[in-house]
Amino acid sequence: MEKFILNVEKRERTGKGIARQLRSKGIIPCVIYKNGQSTPVQIPTKELYTFMNIATREKLFVTLKLDGQEKQAILQDYQVDPVTGKLLHVDFMEVSATEKIRVTIPVVLIGEPIGVKQDKGVLQHGISEIEIEAIPEKIPGHIEVDVSHLEVGDAVHVSDIKFEEGIKVISNPEEVIATVTVEEEEAEVAPSIEETVEPEVIKKGKKAEEEEEK
């Protein structure tokens, strides 16, 4: 797992009003969680954005420097403004270098399937994350899955992924990561009313709403 260092300061005052004041000064309110306990802290916006640009794509093991001590942690959650997209709040989970933790890591598909290149198939994406359990230093930032060998009708499941020793997979092994299907034929011109089928429109996406500051 890639490592990152952030300098943090304790937050003596909390609340929405205080949080807004901090953000106006270029500081983001954050919280460090450990064993059910929480420590309000703050981090300079610029420094935190540099970390977040990587952490939202990779699972990062971060060192938080607080009061002369170093705490090892991972990104647990974050909130953004639903209108501006600006970062509002970040939660970290303090971890032990020797204790196993459960995290989800992103799946990255690489390669172009044979079934797509040669047979005009369509690559369908399944789950985008896999849950694993391991000590922090064993946790990869992401997992790459080569789909170039897939023909039409083939699929890659969680059980097909080979992790290094010391990593336990928690996700359902039968979950589909990717599959290649037959391309749907275009509808005939001027179909009869009985044959007309309205296409289904699937919209994905969810904007995080600001939670009440702790």
UniProtKB/Swiss-Prot annotation:
Record GO cellular component, one term: cytosolic large ribosomal subunit
Any single GO BP term: translation
Transmembrane regions: none
Keyword vocabulary terms for this entry: Ribonucleoprotein, Ribosomal protein, RNA-binding, rRNA-binding
GO MF term (any one): 5S rRNA binding
Similarity section: Belongs to the bacterial ribosomal protein bL25 family. CTC subfamily.
NCBIfam families: bL25_bact_ctc
Protein name: Large ribosomal subunit protein bL25
Organism: Thermodesulfovibrio yellowstonii (strain ATCC 51303 / DSM 11347 / YP87)
Gene field: rplY
